A protein has these predicted regions:
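Long, contiguous binding/interaction regions
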Residues: 1-46, 51-195
Length: 195
């Protein structure tokens, strides 16, 4: 049975990486419902948050394949119950309608929307929440002449995660290129090059 999964992918910031990741989804005919990319809590490491609707077996296989990419450090997949997630939406509404209709103002307050731009001809409101809340406000504002609407990709934090920081520190500690090289001839250079 298909379930909604959120994949959290920790990567290096490399040109073309988004394309490599997208190709992996495309080859498997997996549709991306949402995709967000941002810096993580560690400098130089980026975090992709991708939402898909697939079976657990397909997602597990995809995770294994993604982790084989050179620039990918770690991939996690979680159900909605295992994460805290939000989206942001912007709604553009005719200012005259807002001033005239008390219901609209009450509705915006009920959904926790706040004005980010107020002009004579329109007002832009911002609301954060989950799909149901954002779509419900969209449905309600459509009754009052909604001019424009846009919704962001999902951002999520894994509830039981300790973050990737400790894993990165362990990887750095085990990196063979970082270990000091002992050169037995370092202090005897005058003797080595004598003829």
């Amino acid at each position: 049975m298909k379930t909604e999964y959120t994949l959290t992918i920790y990567t290096e910031n490399q040109v073309g990486l988004i394309n490599k990741i997208a190709i992996m989804f495309s080859r498997r005919k997996i549709s991306l419902e949402s995709m967000n990319s941002s810096p993580s809590e560690i400098a130089g490491i980026y975090r992709f948050t991708i939402v898909v609707s697939e079976t657990e077996a397909v997602v597990k296989n995809l995770v294994k394949q993604l982790e084989k990419l050179v620039d990918v450090f770690k991939v996690y997949f979680n159900t909605n119950d295992e994460i805290v997630w939000q989206q942001m939406a912007l709604y553009k509404v005719n200012t005259a309608v807002i001033m005239k209709e008390v219901k609209v103002e009450r509705l915006l307050r009920e959904f926790g929307a706040k004005a980010v731009v107020i002009r004579d001809d329109y007002t832009v409101f911002e609301a954060t929440g989950q799909d149901e809340e954002i779509n419900k406000l969209l449905e309600e504002l459509s009754k009052y002449g909604l001019i424009e609407f846009v919704k962001s990709a999902r951002i999520a934090i894994i509830k039981n995660s300790k973050g990737i920081h400790n894993k990165v520190l362990k990887m750095e500690a085990n990196d063979p290129t970082k270990k000091p090289i002992n050169n037995e001839f370092l202090n005897h250079k005058s003797m080595i090059f004598e003829m």
